[in-house]
Regions:
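N-terminal glycine-rich FAD/FM-binding segment characteristic of electron-transfer flavoproteins
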Residues: 1-352
Length: 352
């Protein structure tokens, strides 16, 4: 949408992803961030729910903070397909004109978000790590102070391969769209009984040559625990040296009932599967304790773990960037430190 009618666009909308009629956690995380943005703008939060027979999910969205829920309930939306979902979400945007539209950077969201942004002629910033309301340009150009725009969505994300951080705005088009990875934002506590206003919207979905027919759905069967749920993570990087040495990290994790995770280098070396990777191209985690062992601390990795409650780094390089984000740091040989630390903690636990 061009800048002729920007003032018509009001409210913060989020796409409430559901799969098999079960809401994804990212929906609640987006509501949590949307509430902050809406407070700064003096507006409300609307969740957009697409699917078939999904009206029963509206109560939960209200309990997590949505003020309104727009429901598009249509048999064509039973299982995610790009075309009908893109038509439905674009229709919602064109009808209700949100100022901001947030989408989860999931497999579904990374397909849906860009498709919809192109159809409604606006920009989209992908994989944001920070969202806030502010001025753009952030610093007014001397002599052009009147050109600075206020109450803009400032979208921050890693750029140039993660070697720098960029803050991006979309001042001349609406809605301002962003995708956010799961785990980056925090959901609000559930408020039992809180109700959202439910709005039923039934746009026409037109079958065209971009529709696909789903012949069969084969669900992946996995027994991998989710590192995003762990209270204690013992994470290893290139400095661990080998797949066999991760047994040493597992022993430390077992003391706490925690899990082992890793950096991208460990995945590339075949030491652990990508399910266990923390960072920009892995998962964002917030454990109570995060051990960074043999991890240098590249910005890509730090982006996925810097909000852990307590960070303990072990590295032989005293100048490793990881020490700048760690609460505690130990410089030395991890092959000596980790087993000694494990035994000391075991003894401490035994005495309690």
């Amino acid at each position: 949408m061009n800048n002729m009618g920007l003032e018509e666009y009001k409210g913060v909308f989020i796409y409430a992803q559901q799969v098999d009629n079960e809401l994804s956690s990212i929906a609640f995380e987006l509501i949590g961030k949307a509430k902050e943005l809406a407070k700064d703008l003096g507006t409300d939060v609307t969740a957009v729910l697409l699917g078939s027979n999904v009206k029963g999910l509206t109560d939960e969205l209200g309990e997590y903070g949505a003020d309104k829920v727009i429901v598009v309930d249509n048999p064509e939306l039973k299982t995610y397909r790009t075309e009908p979902y893109a038509q439905a979400l674009a229709a919602v945007i064109n009808e209700y004109k949100p100022e901001i539209m947030l989408v989860g950077a999931t497999a579904i969201g990374r397909d849906l978000g860009p498709t919809v942004s192109a159809r409604v002629a606006t920009g989209l910033t992908a994989d944001c790590t920070k969202l806030e309301i502010g001025d753009f340009p952030i610093n007014a150009v001397p002599g052009k102070e009147d050109e600075q725009k206020h109450n803009q969505l400032l979208m921050t994300r890693p750029a140039f391969g993660g070697n720098t951080i960029a803050t991006i705005a979309c001042p001349d088009n609406r809605p301002q769209m962003a995708t956010v990875r799961p785990g980056v934002m925090q959901k609000l506590p559930k408020e039992a009984g809180r109700k959202a206003e439910v709005i039923e919207f039934n746009p026409t979905l037109e079958k065209n040559n971009r529709y696909v027919d789903i012949l069969n759905v084969v669900k992946a069967v996995g027994n991998v625990e989710n590192i995003m749920d762990a209270k204690v993570l013992v994470s290893g990087g290139r400095g661990v040296g080998s797949k066999e040495n991760f047994k040493m990290l597992q022993d430390l994790a077992d003391v706490f009932g925690g899990m082992v995770s890793c950096s991208r280098a460990a995945v590339e070396n075949g030491w652990l599967a990508q399910d266990y990777q923390v960072g920009q191209t892995g998962k964002t985690v917030r454990p109570q304790i995060y051990f960074a062992i043999g991890i240098s601390g590249a910005i890509q990795h730090v982006a996925g773990m810097e909000e852990s409650d307590l960070i303990i780094a072990i590295n032989k390089d005293e100048d490793a960037p990881i020490f700048s984000v760690a609460d505690y740091g130990i410089v030395g040989d991890l092959n000596k430190i980790v087993p000694a630390l494990t035994e000391a903690l075991k003894a401490e636990m035994k005495n309690k």
